[in-house]
């Protein structure tokens, strides 16, 4: 499966051959190939840009991740506590619990900047906070999020010229380069569904 660059970290749970596993996935700065174990079933949760784990610095997760120990079908260990292993319908309850316990925290300044607000701090401070919260620069976060949005619009049938205008690309070659770097697909492949399986799920659960 083609993996897609992403500015968000996440939790992933999977079952394979009767065993249950859990891990933390980090932000990804480029497209690549992700192995998919045969017969495995997955549940994934992506966290909003600016959210982070108190016990694991996000920069340490970039282009990687960690396997969580002591995982069973019923529970897993994270941040010094045990949590119920979620199914697809239990993700929101798990996230609420992680936030209440302080296991997951969020930098509100990063969230405000992403919404277009101009904080009363220096650009250097904003950049430092972005790196601490996401492991990435503000510019890289913006480029990755824009490329993913472009891929979603193209998959939905929007013309490339409209995507260029809507998302602020210079021209169609600029859009094409971004898609190759961050999504691993051409405009035509996205519109026609070509290129094989891709880790770009329009219905994937996303937390704020």
Regions found by a protein language model. Name each.
Residues 1-123, 133-138, 152-155, 159-170, ...:
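Alpha-helical bundle regulatory/interaction domains
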Residues 146-149:
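Pre-recognition alpha-helix immediately N-terminal to the DNA-recognition helix
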Residues 130, 142, 179-180, 191:
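DNA major-groove recognition helix of helix-turn-helix
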Residues 169-171, 178-182:
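The feature captures the conserved acid-bearing segment of alpha/beta-hydrolase catalytic domains
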